């Protein structure tokens, strides 16, 4: 079970970017600097065109009242334990972890709050800081050591319908950052479940994460109370204090992609430069052509996730 750690003396009195809505305060650097205003939310909120309200409870709970939640007996554990005894995501980066859904126990479950299958729902467990980078605007870094597999933060914001996504993208200029992310999950019957999240105006600290071609975070959809997944970011390796946190905007990192998803990411003509500095840097940020209306081609004022 999560507990709020004591705030380090050096962080006391500093701006809390999270406005007191997270387990731990999120400081900003340099002192006196403050990111552009936005409405903070630690969780998804329903936006225009959303197919489902992420705040509604749609999953039944397990009946593990007197026994621990284990695969085969707990309805929330479909295949195997999601986390180990240290609250680390099991087999992170493996093909199985990228293809099997992750369900945590929820508010209707009869198991204890100390259940090992409750991790993402407890929020921030490490001190994070929003900071000004040299070439990428604002970024997010950790002030603590983060072991491989531990949950770091969510990417939370407005859950949108595709028409609203395309409308918002069309209004962007080449100089605007696009925070909208499209998550596509290929289910057993060949269908694709799409989730669109935009934290530009309403979101959490995940909006400050920059792209890297060799990131230290991996995004995994995690479901708790609703079919709308939480976009949970886990440490793909051990992360040292003051390291910038990043993930791969394209979803390619440690993940198998379907051919149609690769095509969506490769069709873009206009690309923003990538400043991640990785040895395998692709030189340009990923571009998702599906965010544009299929009947229209983006002109010089439009760009994908950046």
Curated annotation (Swiss-Prot):
**Protein source organism:** Bos taurus (Bovine)
**Record's SUPFAM superfamilies?**
SET domain (SSF82199)
> Keywords assigned by UniProt?
Chromatin regulator, Chromosome, Metal-binding, Methyltransferase, Nucleus, S-adenosyl-L-methionine, Transferase, Zinc
Name the UniProt record assigns to this protein: Histone-lysine N-methyltransferase SETMAR
Question: So which domain of life are we looking at?
Answer: Eukaryota
Q: What does this protein do?
A: Histone methyltransferase that methylates 'Lys-4' and 'Lys-36' of histone H3, 2 specific tags for epigenetic transcriptional activation. Specifically mediates dimethylation of H3 'Lys-36'.
Mainly localized where? nucleus
Under SMART domains, the record lists: PreSET, SET
Q: Which residues bind S-adenosyl-L-methionine?
A: 136-138, 179, 207, 210-211
Matching InterPro entries: H3K9_Histone-Lys_N-MTase (IPR050973), Post-SET_dom (IPR003616), Pre-SET_dom (IPR007728), SET_dom (IPR001214), SET_dom_sf (IPR046341)
Ranges of residues in domain Pre-SET? 60-123
Q: Does the keyword field hold S-adenosyl-L-methionine?
A: yes
Q: Which residues form the SET domain?
A: 126-250
Pfam families annotated for this entry? Pre-SET, SET
User: Hey, which family's this protein in?
Assistant: Belongs to the class V-like SAM-binding methyltransferase superfamily.
Binding of Zn(2+) 3 occurs at 69, 105, 111, 115
Which positions bind Zn(2+) 4?
Answer: 213, 274, 276, 281
Where, per UniProt, does this protein localize? Nucleus; Chromosome
E.C. number: 2.1.1.357
- What GO molecular function terms would the record report? double-stranded DNA binding; histone H3K36 dimethyltransferase activity; histone H3K4 methyltransferase activity; histone methyltransferase activity; zinc ion binding
Taxonomy of the source species:
Eukaryota, Metazoa, Chordata, Craniata, Vertebrata
Cited PROSITE patterns: POST_SET, PRE_SET, SET
This protein's GO cellular component annotations are: chromosome; nucleus
């Amino acid at each position: 079970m999560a507990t709020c750690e004591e705030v380090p003396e050096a962080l006391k009195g500093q701006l809390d970017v999270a406005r007191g809505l997270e387990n731990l305060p999120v400081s900003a650097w340099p002192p006196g600097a403050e990111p552009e205003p936005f409405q903070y939310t630690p969780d998804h909120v329903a936006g225009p065109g959303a197919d489902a309200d992420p705040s509604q409870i749609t999953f039944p709970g397990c009946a593990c009242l007197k026994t621990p939640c284990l695969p085969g007996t707990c309805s929330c554990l479909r295949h195997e334990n999601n986390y180990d005894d240290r609250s680390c995501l099991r087999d992170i980066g493996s093909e199985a972890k990228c293809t099997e859904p992750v369900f945590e126990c929820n508010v209707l479950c009869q198991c204890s709050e100390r259940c090992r299958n409750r991790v993402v729902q407890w929020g921030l467990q490490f001190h994070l800081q929003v900071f000004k980078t040299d070439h990428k605007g604002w970024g997010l870094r950790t002030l603590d050591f983060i072991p491989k597999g531990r949950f770091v933060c969510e990417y939370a914001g407005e859950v949108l319908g595709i028409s609203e996504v395309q409308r918002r993208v069309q209004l962007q200029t080449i100089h605007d950052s696009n925070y909208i992310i499209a998550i596509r999950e290929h289910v057993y019957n060949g269908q694709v479940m799409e989730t669109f999240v935009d934290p530009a105006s309403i979101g959490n600290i995940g909006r400050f994460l920059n792209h890297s071609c060799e990131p230290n975070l991996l995004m995994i959809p995690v479901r708790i109370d609703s079919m709308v997944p939480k976009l949970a970011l886990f440490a793909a390796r051990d992360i040292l204090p003051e390291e910038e946190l990043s993930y791969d905007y394209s979803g390619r990192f440690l993940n198998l992609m379907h051919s149609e998803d690769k095509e969506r990411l490769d069709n873009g003509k206009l690309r923003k430069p990538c400043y991640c500095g990785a040895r395998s840097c692709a030189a340009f940020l990923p571009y998702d052509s599906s965010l544009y209306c299929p009947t229209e081609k983006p002109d010089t004022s439009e760009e994908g996730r950046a």
